């Protein structure tokens, strides 16, 4: 097991605390896949409790006693029959990551990231966040007894997420700027070795997130979807999920790979614009804006990995408007009973748009990833809903309303 630069190929020991290569390239974790292949099988995996740590051989942990867990993973994969009829498609699933302990997919990364911090003997961890990362890191820091500092863009974080980070006991700092400004600041703290950085620039955190791919295959009885649609903000998740599918293929668990499709908000779509030009590099947005706060990121750190995932898989990238996001959020709630935050609904909005554009075949088996629970941002849901009806204690009025249902 080692760290390898995706740009120049230089390798580093796994115990070296480094976030990017000397050349500036992003790092990824590489394993002895032949050794994993000898150790795992579908049958062996199935005998273990479902969750992130079911797939231990694929995770960068040397000492199991150092694992920090809140029973993350094992999230439901819903067959969405009502949405299939609504959208006119054959087979649709939603992988609901809002069912994780702190309500988002970030918990998968943090269980591995904070475990790694444990192995390294780190005492102080930190991150910049649009909300979910801070909530998750704060929870896992509390679980492990570590000190935690999180930087958030002032006034740009949904209250549900802010409340979590504060209540778990992290030192919460609000920065007068955007997410990218906050990230620059924590990266400097990490450079000066004042914190162990657990944003998705840290390759160990992404190792936990790749287990989404493992679970999808597991829950589909080792079948592979034709396409996986992922909301894209800092771009770590789509990269991690693609890596998970590839590692299952390398080790003989599956023999096909899905098309990875990334969805960004129209006000923060540097990866989509790069994809349209078939470019390898993005042009950052200086002032990203969208109702989907979790993906309101103008300069995604993992853009090179995300674009590689999209290009290598024959996938696609598309942007959706705030109006399309809200419509999809309502559609998912009212047709399937799944309540997600706005950023999560971008995967459904993107599916709908790409079906209308003829990019996605209606016979495909599709999995949409929803990344966070609706209670993360209840204000957005309330703003998008009708006002509750107010009445006196009058049964006649109540029955009249009942007839109008």
Swiss-Prot record:
Keyword Amino-acid biosynthesis attributed? yes
Its BP terms in the Gene Ontology are: cysteine biosynthetic process; threonine biosynthetic process
Recorded GO MF terms: pyridoxal phosphate binding; threonine synthase activity
Functional pathway: Amino-acid biosynthesis; L-threonine biosynthesis; L-threonine from L-aspartate: step 5/5
Name the catalysed reactions: O-phospho-L-homoserine + H2O = L-threonine + phosphate
Keyword presence, Lyase: yes
Q: PTM N6-(pyridoxal phosphate)lysine: at which residues?
A: 106
Q: Which GO terms describe its cellular component?
A: cytoplasm
Per its UniProt record, what PROSITE patterns does this chain match?
DEHYDRATASE_SER_THR
Residue ranges annotated as transmembrane are none
Task: Give the protein family.
Answer: Belongs to the threonine synthase family.
Q: Which function does this protein serve?
A: Catalyzes the gamma-elimination of phosphate from L-phosphohomoserine and the beta-addition of water to produce L-threonine.
Name by which UniProt lists this protein: Threonine synthase
């Amino acid at each position: 097991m080692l760290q390898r630069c995706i740009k120049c190929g230089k390798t580093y020991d796994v115990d070296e605390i480094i976030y990017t290569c000397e050349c500036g390239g992003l790092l990824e974790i590489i394993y002895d896949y032949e050794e994993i292949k000898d150790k795992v099988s579908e049958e062996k995996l199935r005998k273990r409790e479902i969750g992130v740590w079911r797939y231990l051989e694929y995770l960068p942990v040397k000492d199991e006693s150092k694992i920090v867990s809140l029973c993350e993973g094992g999230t439901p994969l819903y067959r969405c029959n009502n949405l299939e009829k609504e959208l006119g498609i054959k087979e649709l699933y939603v992988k609901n990551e809002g069912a994780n302990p702190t309500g988002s997919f970030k918990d998968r990364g943090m269980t591995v990231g904070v475990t790694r911090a444990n192995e390294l003997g780190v005492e102080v961890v930190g991150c910049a966040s649009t909300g979910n990362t801070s909530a998750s890191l704060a929870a896992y820091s509390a679980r492990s007894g570590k000190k935690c500092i999180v930087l958030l863009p002032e006034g740009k974080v949904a209250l549900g997420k802010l409340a979590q980070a504060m209540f778990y006991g992290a030192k919460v700092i609000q920065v007068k700027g955007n997410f990218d400004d906050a990230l620059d600041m924590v990266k400097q703290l990490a450079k000066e070795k004042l914190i162990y950085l657990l944003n998705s620039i840290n390759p160990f955190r992404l190792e936990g997130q790749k287990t989404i791919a493992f679970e999808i295959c597991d829950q589909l009885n080792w079948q592979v979807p034709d396409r996986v649609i992922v909301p894209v903000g800092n771009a770590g998740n789509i990269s991690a999920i693609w890596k998970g599918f590839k590692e299952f293929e390398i080790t003989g668990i599956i023999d096909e790979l899905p098309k990875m499709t990334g969805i960004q908000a129209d006000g923060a779509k540097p990866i989509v614009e790069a994809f349209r030009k078939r470019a390898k590099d993005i042009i950052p947005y200086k002032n990203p804006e969208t109702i989907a706060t979790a993906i309101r990121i103008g300069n995604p750190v993992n853009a090179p990995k995300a674009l590689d995932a999209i290009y290598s898989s024959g996938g696609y990238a598309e942007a959706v408007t705030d109006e399309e996001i809200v419509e999809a959020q309502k559609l998912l709630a009212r047709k399937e009973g799944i309540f997600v935050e706005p950023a999560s609904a971008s995967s459904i909005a993107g599916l709908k748009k790409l079906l209308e554009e003829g990019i996605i075949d209606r016979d495909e088996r599709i999995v949409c990833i929803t990344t966070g629970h609706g209670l993360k941002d209840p204000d957005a849901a309330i703003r998008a809903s009708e006002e509750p009806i107010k009445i006196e204690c009058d049964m006649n009025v109540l029955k009249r309303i009942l007839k109008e249902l």
